[in-house]
Structures are given as C-alpha cells and as structure tokens.
C-alpha cells in the first residue's frame, strides 16, 4: 500500500521500470540491509520522482504495532531563533490539548534540507504539516507533493504564495506602520529600513507598512535608506557606512530584534547617543530586547498565539471541519512595545 499522485502506480511498476523484483523494491523502500546502498538509493530516487511513498503506517498496522497517525509534522527554519521557538511552544502545547503529537524538523534555512524533511514526513505518514519556508526556497514542488497526496498544509510566518494553502501570519503591515508612525511622532524624519529579501511576503508587508507611514505623514520616501539586511552580523557591517553619510538617517526600523540590536551596538560604538542622536525600533520582542542598553523599542509578534492558531487550523483540515478546498487565513495582531531606544 502506498500514497502517490497516480493511484495506479505500484511497486510492480517500479520493479518493471528498473528491471528488479518486487521483493527488491519492497526491501529497498523499507531500508533493508539485504540491499546494497547503491541499489536502495536508485530505487528510492525513482520512487520519489514518481511521487511514490510507502505507507509505513499501514505496514505497521498490519503487524498491530501502531494506531493510525495523529502526528503533525512541523518544519521550523531555526529552533534557536526566539520567535520560532515561541511559535513551536504554542504548537506543541495546543497539539497536546487537541490530542496530537508533533514531529519537529529544522530546515536551517536550506531548500535542499526542507525537501528531504517533506519526504521524511510523507514516508512517516504525518496527518498534516505546519511549516515556515526556508529563506532560499524558490521552488515549491515538495509542498505541492504533500498537497497532491492529501496532506493538509498550514504555513506560518513565511507563507508560500505559490501554493493555495491555509496560513497563520502576524499583521506585519500594521506592525510596521505603527512602529514607523511612532518614530515620526517622536521627531524622526529620515528613517532607514533594514529588511529581508523582498521575495519573502513578510518583508514586502513590513516594507509596505514602513513606506505608507512615511508617505501618510507627508515625508519624502528615500529609497537610498532601504537595505536588505536581516541579521546582526550584516547590520554591524552595514551600519557604519549608513551612519557616516552626510545625509545619515536619524532613525532605523529593522525587520527583527537581532538586526536592531546590531544597529544599536554599532551606533553606540561610533559615539552616537541612543535615542538622542538616533532612534531604533525592532520587530519580535524577544528576550534580547530587554537585555540590551538601552532596552529596545520593538513590535511584539505573539509567536505563541501564532503556534496555537496554526494547530487549530490544521486540525480543522485533518478532522474535516472545513469544507474541502477551503483556505483559512488567520491574522494575529501585533503590539508596539515602547522602551529606551526611541524618544
């Protein structure tokens, strides 16, 4: 028994195409030591290319080893990242309440690893997948395979616009709009934006909030103050150049706290007083926001709530509480937390 995009495709088809026995195919897909590594990889590769995955749960049921899957697959870009760890906490807690377990894998922001994780989830017959895509993911066939095989998908934080799937996001646009409005209302006029690559929906939305706040308040939108910079190391490298300009900014809005803290320490090292000479606002409200001096003004994302909502949406799909094909979009509100890096 297997799950695949073509219901007529079987182990017999694989055996015929590769010139081996059905028993050899079966052993290879079960990772039997009786088959050479080279032969196993050849058979597994062919099976993957044809969307054929052995139904391990069904095999185990025949031997009365497990109950049907109630396992949710979770793909997280970086477990060590504060925001993602709070989302994971919300997912785990809500899954437990709803009677599900989770299988967690870290993509490390790598497309190739993300693909392998999806294959692993399919082989283990998870009942659904909650995922935030890796930064370098630009092709989505691995997600489409899940959808074709009837595995519900829910995206969080970084959503995949190439797939019609449910998603849970924070209100990135309004969070950015509110943050930049705060900077303007406290006297800032030249506000730099440090963002992620614009292929990511969150970066587009936060940039749009930044831009619209500036224009709404009658200020000039200076695109020379818009940079792709989304981590502390890059911020510490870029900021000296930005603050050395004759027309330097008097404020920074950063796409995350890590980047904002890189700006903060660089500005202080250069002799600027924060917030008197330059104001800084981040986006996360993680533990580091209160560990720096001065403490960071930032936008709170409420990751735990994002995780809870993602589980609820996925379970609604798994338990058929939503009509087939219905797409849910949940938006979690942000909150501006004003501290010492703004006036």
Residue ranges and their predicted role:
Residues 1-6, 10, 66-181, 185, ...:
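Alpha-helical recognition/docking segments in bacterial nutrient-uptake
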Residues 1-68, 343:
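N-terminal helix-turn-helix DNA-binding module of bacterial transcription factors
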Residues 17, 22-27, 62-80, 182, ...:
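Short beta-strand segments enriched in small/hydrophobic residues
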Residues 21, 127, 189-190, 250:
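Short acidic/polar active-site loop segments enriched in Thr and Asp
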Residues 76-86, 104-113, 135, 158, ...:
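Hinge/beta->alpha junction and helix N-cap segments in small-molecule ligand-binding domains
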Residues 190, 221-225, 274-279:
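Short acidic capping loops at alpha-helix termini that bridge into adjacent secondary structure
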Residues 238-343:
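Flexible loop/turn connectors
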């Amino acid at each position: 028994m297997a799950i695949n995009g073509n219901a007529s495709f079987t182990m017999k088809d694989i055996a015929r195409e590769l010139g081996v026995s059905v028993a050899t195919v079966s052993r290879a897909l079960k990772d039997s030591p009786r088959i050479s590594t080279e032969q196993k990889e050849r058979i597994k590769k062919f099976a993957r290319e044809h969307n054929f995955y052995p139904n391990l749960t069904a095999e185990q049921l025949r031997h009365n080893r497990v109950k049907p899957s109630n396992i949710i697959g979770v793909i997280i870009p970086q477990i060590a990242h504060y925001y993602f760890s709070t989302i994971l906490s919300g997912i785990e807690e809500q899954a437990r309440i709803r009677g599900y377990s989770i299988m967690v894998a870290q993509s490390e922001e790598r497309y190739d690893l993300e693909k392998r994780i999806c294959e692993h989830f399919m082989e283990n017959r998870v009942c659904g997948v909650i995922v935030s895509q890796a930064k370098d993911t630009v092709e989505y066939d691995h997600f489409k395979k899940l959808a074709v095989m009837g595995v519900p998908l829910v995206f969080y934080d970084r959503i995949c616009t190439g797939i019609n799937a449910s998603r849970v996001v924070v209100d990135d646009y309004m969070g950015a709009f509110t943050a930049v409005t705060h900077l303007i209302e406290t006297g800032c006029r030249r506000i730099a934006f440090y963002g992620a690559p614009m292929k990511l929906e969150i970066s587009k939305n936060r940039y749009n909030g930044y831009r619209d706040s500036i224009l709404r308040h009658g200020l000039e939108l200076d695109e020379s103050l818009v940079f792709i910079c989304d981590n502390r190391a890059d911020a510490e490298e870029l900021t000296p150049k930005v603050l050395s300009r004759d027309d330097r900014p008097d404020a920074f809005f950063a796409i995350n706290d890590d980047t904002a803290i890189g700006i903060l320490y660089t500005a202080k090292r250069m002799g600027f007083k924060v917030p008197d000479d330059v104001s800084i606002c981040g986006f996360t409200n993680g533990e580091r926001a209160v560990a720096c001096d001065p403490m960071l003004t930032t936008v709170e994302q409420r990751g735990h709530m994002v995780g809870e909502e993602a589980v609820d949406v996925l379970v609604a799909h798994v338990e058929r509480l939503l009509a087939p094909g219905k797409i849910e979009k949940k938006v979690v509100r942000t909150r501006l937390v004003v501290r010492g890096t703004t006036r």
